[in-house]
Amino acid sequence: MLTTLPEFFDKEHEDLLREFEGAQILREYRAAAWQNAVRMPFPGKKDEAWRRISLDALLSTPLEFFPDKKAHLPAGTGISAREAVFYAGTLATGLGINEARLEPALEQAGVIFRDYADVERGDPLLLADINGKVVPPADGKFAAAASALADRGVFLHIPARFRIEKPLLVRLAASNPGSAAFTHNIIKLEAGASAVVVLDFASDGAAKQTEKGLHAGILEIHLGEGADLTLVELQKFGPKLWNITHERAILERDARLHWVYGALGAALSKNFIETSLIGEGAEVKMHGFYFAGGEQVFDLDTQQNHLAARTTSDLLYKGAAAGSSKTVWEGMIYVDPQAMQTDGLQTNRNLVLSAGAEVSALPGLEILADDVRCSHGATIGKLDEDELFYLQTRGIPRVEAEQLIIEGFFGEITAQVPIAELQSEITEIIKARFELAVQR
């Protein structure tokens, strides 16, 4: 049955919540989250974090909630034979598929790499100590909805001092056209553990997709003392899907996180991406890229929280906007009074590729401690005519010259992806996005 979001949240849906299996503590968690979701108003123009975008189209569109899980799997969202060999573990989940593979040595070492719903049914106590601890349902209406209603996602737990040499791949099919989907993703590394994880969000993303859909998700990351995680997160949803996520990482003492985030798909994508350094010596690098075209809207809200002494954060996000698209980046570095000798850096660079595109960049600092080194900056500009002229004098047509400059602009970010084949895939997507922008 098709229902708008306001109509859906206007009902109790106790029967729906009862369908989720798991221990009593998890049922209580979902029930409490649902009450938060019902009680909270939908965000709007009066909310600072939401005032630059509109959810009117989303709220007025009828969607199907929890459609037939045997619905077709989007092309390209399964795991290829080549990927199965290259990665130490692969997980494809959503839309009727649940395929998990992990090298036997990792299983024997105690690594858990499974679908969130499977863990809830089979080993619910694994979730009890982290569910909602990193991203509380109170973070927002959509965070609460995902906490209450998620029926897919990844659960990764790596035991102390275990280092996974080969990367892990998660391919998450989030939503069929015309439907709403909710995901809950958890990555937990115990003290001294390390891993490289690729989190690939997909939908029925063919360019011909005509039906609208919604994905609301949360990502909870907890890194124990001295843990080391490289996370490559790619959002490649279809062109008619709304994507809203709340994502946060907590770092204990001397933990390290390198988080590469890429936004390329969706009609509208609103993402809260936050790191909290709660242990001395914790360090985070945040690299991001986004390329909007057509009428796409990207709104990225990043937060670097320094909550302990001698912590380091370094953020570099780059974006481009073509057609009549709109991009918003808003960043904040927060330094707690106890976070002495903090080193925080925040940089945002943007290219405006057409007269109809709209770009906003809003860096921010809130420093409550002395003896810190923090800086922030943002730029919005067009392609450099001198660079274009130089390339054209070398016999390169203007369109090709523009493409080369854009590839170089994003290259600083894509080079941070530690997997060569994935770098090439991202570069090809950026090329295709530019070619589409030129055609329009």
Predicted regions and their residues:
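N-terminal amphipathic, basic helical "cap/leader" segment at the start of enzyme domains
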Residues: M1-A144, L316, A322
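Conserved beta-strand/loop scaffold segments within soluble protein domains that form the structured core
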Residues: N98, P104-I396, F410, T414-R440
